[in-house]
Amino acid sequence: MKVTGTLTLSNRGMVKYVYFKAGEIVFAASTDVNDRLGEILIKCCKLSREHLEHALQLSKRSAGLKKLGALLVENGFVTPKDLFIGLKTQVKDIIYSLFLWTDGDYRFEEKLPSDIIQLQINIKELITEIIQRIKQQA
């Protein structure tokens, strides 16, 4: 059975979401500051802290109507390709972090938010990459 919906996982006040469509992971989100798109783009050397702060101010002025990624591209702070790489890295990092959890709670809701970005994430490649990362840290 290929499910569509949102898997919500929580642990020690942190909440992470994994979004599925027809059994495939299409996106992930998190309340962890380190999982934010801007922080990931900075970590990947695709964005400066100054440009991130400017884009966040623009986002506040738009009352959240414009997504951060769109503002970053519109203002020339990142290329569409770098944004795509950042989004995929964000999803991979969030899911990787879940493999490190030793406890927590979860629930699945057969509903996707209408405003999420939907990427194509190859689950087999993702799991292989996560196993390699875990082995490297061991």
Show which residues each predicted segment covers.
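Acidic, Ser/Thr/Pro-enriched low-complexity segments and adjacent helix/loop capping patches
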Residues: 1-138
